[in-house]
Amino acid sequence: MSKMWSGRFNANASTLLDQFNASLPFDKELYLQDIQGSIAHATMLAKQGILSQEEAESIIHGLKTVKEKIENGQFEWNIEDEDIHMAIEKALTNLIGDAGKKLHTARSRNDQVALDFRLYVQQSNKDLIRLLANLMQTLINIAKNHTQTLIPGMTHLQHAQPISFAYHLLAYASMFKRDIERFQSSFERNNYSPIGCAALAGTPHPIDREMTAQELGFDAPTINCLDTVSDRDFALEILFNIATMFMHISRLSEELILWSSYEFGFVTLSDEYSTGSSIMPQKKNPDVPELLRGKTGRAYGNLMALLTVMKGLPLAYNKDMQEDKEGVFDSVKNAKISLEILNETLKTMNINKEKMEAATKIGHLTATDLADYLVEKIGIPFREAHFITGKAVALAEQKQKDLSELSLAELQSIDPRIQNDVLQYLDLQHSMNARNSYGGTAKEQVEKQIEYFERFLEELEG
């Protein structure tokens, strides 16, 4: 079968070339964006007198018919059509005749694919913002019920200081807020229309790029046609943003895996979002967070793949750039389902408050509070207080106690200047609520953080 570009060729493309060269098996994902762009283009061509109104109406009606056929499963895909643009144009021409051949006036596949792909990425930015907002709201809802639930705050996966479970969850809410802001920033930066750039240098036809930009929901046309058809930084941005988001998801997933183990027992994942073993009847495996952790590597790979594709390309379009889409489609689809299932996993898990609070009674979590007491009440330098507290911890270890369980007499054996008021400093709830500096774990600060994040989500929705 001859191609639409076959005029200068003396032989048909080989079947092997069709198999190697065609992007249709994956870029048919862009059918909706391709049709949207073509409708806007035809509308503009008619307004500019390049097409007659009758031709434009025939084209638009035909494109809507093609869309219905695709969505009803009646469209016949043929790899010889090469890509989604040619597949739709051929179907349109077969449907309405010669008017269909005029649609490509003042347009190249170079700006056409840049448009389709950008529309897809922009919609994906909006979808991911919505799903991240849902996840943030779930974290906030859980946090509201646990502003006083103690867990060990850790560094190096070792017990460090007492914090609230709410505070821990809000740390992830803060990360996901920044993820939302990255998607927002990318959307705003890339909300410019490629259509009308043609092959690389614009077109001599009297087109109206401002009109098509407005029709398609863009802020304005892109400023330089050569750049527009040559670069895929908008695709790299969403890949980077997804990779960063997955890094945050992976860290939360790792903690869910740890917390759901017998060794921690902080949470119990619901049966709906757990799996079993084919040989060990007792097993209840945290497959959801494990898969989320695994998919993070895949998101990183897609980012590095496109960076590598783009790094040495001369201007303008090169066929290498056909390799831009599959990784983006893959990352976007994985990101969407990952956000949905993580959200449901969090909503349905059981929180074992008693296990969390029991874990705070080991590991000497109030050691820093003792050092602070020595500085505040006795007036010694912090480094000296640090040393004395270390001696107290060593004594507690020797007596197989937690630091908070040492008696006043035992503490005074380390330093006789310690008085009875030290005991409140060693109380876990007091320790947590004493950290009332801005951004701290005290209940007052956590409630302010909840209010801050809820206000952010309200403004996002508005």
UniProtKB/Swiss-Prot annotation:
Q: Which PROSITE patterns match?
A: FUMARATE_LYASES (PS00163)
Q: Which GO terms describe its biological process?
A: arginine biosynthetic process via ornithine; L-arginine biosynthetic process
Indicate the enzyme's highest-level EC class: lyase
Q: Which domain of life is it from?
A: Bacteria
UniProtKB keywords: Amino-acid biosynthesis, Arginine biosynthesis, Cytoplasm, Lyase
Where located?
Cytoplasm
Name the GO cellular-component terms: cytosol
E.C. number? 4.3.2.1
InterPro entries, per the entry: Arg_succ_lyase_C, Argininosuccinate_lyase, Fumarase/histidase_N, Fumarate_lyase_CS, Fumarate_lyase_fam, Fumarate_lyase_N, L-Aspartase-like
Quick check: keyword Cytoplasm in the entry? yes
SUPFAM superfamilies xref list? L-aspartase-like (SSF48557)
The reply to whether RNA-binding figures as a keyword in the UniProt entry is no
Q: In which pathway does it act?
A: Amino-acid biosynthesis; L-arginine biosynthesis; L-arginine from L-ornithine and carbamoyl phosphate: step 3/3
- An MF annotation (GO) of this entry: argininosuccinate lyase activity
- Per its UniProt record, what Pfam families does this chain match? ASL_C2, Lyase_1
- What reaction does this catalyse? 2-(N(omega)-L-arginino)succinate = fumarate + L-arginine
Family per similarity comment: Belongs to the lyase 1 family. Argininosuccinate lyase subfamily.
> What is the protein's given name?
Argininosuccinate lyase
Q: Which organism is it from?
A: Nitratiruptor sp. (strain SB155-2)
